[in-house]
């Protein structure tokens, strides 16, 4: 009977070190999505691959407190802390949405020491596209 050949490389033993810490990212893009209910901060490299992300919900805020500026500031600080350790020095900021956390997240990003090349508002605005939902009657 033939002996089974051992697997040369499987998915489990293929990686020796942690993949997250192996990359040094000098430049990236910080996306801030600020809705009225939550603020999500995603940090990607220039090609668009996600490096780090955080939201007000993952920082422990629940309910209406997720939409506050302080929650947005905490979420931005959490997301940025990991990429500063990986060596990010320059970034572009894309802010989307009408929420209260827009300015607070931007202040937290400025305070982190990352040099911002530009800040762009990418809030989607319809050119009279879809009909909006009917007004609430309370």
UniProtKB/Swiss-Prot annotation:
UniProt record similarity statement: Belongs to the universal ribosomal protein uS11 family.
Assigned GO CC terms: chloroplast; ribonucleoprotein complex; ribosome
An annotated GO BP: translation
NCBIfam families hit by this protein: PRK05309.1, uS11_bact
Biased composition (Basic residues): 9-24
Taxonomic source organism: Manihot esculenta
Plastid in keyword set: yes
Subunit structure and binding partners: Part of the 30S ribosomal subunit.
Pfam families assigned: Ribosomal_S11 (PF00411)
A molecular function GO annotation: structural constituent of ribosome
SUPFAM superfamilies: Translational machinery components
Designated name of the protein: Small ribosomal subunit protein uS11c
